Amino acid sequence: MEFEERLRDRQWSVGNACSVAKLLDLLSTKTVFLAVRESLFGTTRFEDFVERIGTSAPAVSRALKQLEASGLMVRVPYQEPGKRARDEYRLTAAGEDLLPVYQAIRQGRDKYLQKGGRGPLCFVDRESGNRVGVIVTDDPNAATVSAGDIEIRLNR
């Protein structure tokens, strides 16, 4: 990448307007980011977040509250027969838009941090069976898939 001419003197800075910095403020802890991952994987119930993330209930509670306050997640009431009403946690459209962010991080780190460049999971399009990945493209008609179109499998 290269800056356009007027930005090349390096006196200019994106500063507080940087969307990446704003996102990192929202995803400020490992637990918050893993809560997003688990939501993308379909986790919705508090106790399942605690178990799947592998951290304390207070840490998960703080993470879910932070995601809700930032507009990335909402609470949705549910009630099982004979039990008290409780809340599920679901990603908003803004939260679901983090799918390519998660996939880009996972894809890049699988390549460099995992033995043989392969992580424990692979992500495939349910319909075609093709692996799903993230690329930088200038094609406005490039194929896209949503989280609901992806099947997560163990890498073999």
Region spans (language model):
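C-terminal regulatory/oligomerization modules of transcriptional regulators
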Residues: M1-F3, Q103, Q107-R156
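Canonical helix-turn-helix DNA-binding module
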Residues: V50-V76
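Basic, amphipathic "hinge/linker" alpha-helix immediately C-terminal to the N-terminal HTH DNA-binding motif
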Residues: S28, E80-Y102
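Residue-level recognition of short loop/turn positions
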Residues: S70, A94, E127-S128
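Extended, folded domain segments that form the structural surfaces/walls around functional sites
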Residues: V36, T44-E51, L64, A94, ...
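N-terminal leader segment of winged-helix/HTH proteins
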Residues: M1-L24, S70
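N-terminal helix-turn-helix DNA-binding core of bacterial DNA-binding proteins
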Residues: C18-T55, A59
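Short, contiguous, well-ordered secondary-structure segments
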Residues: E5-R8, L72-Q79, D97-A104
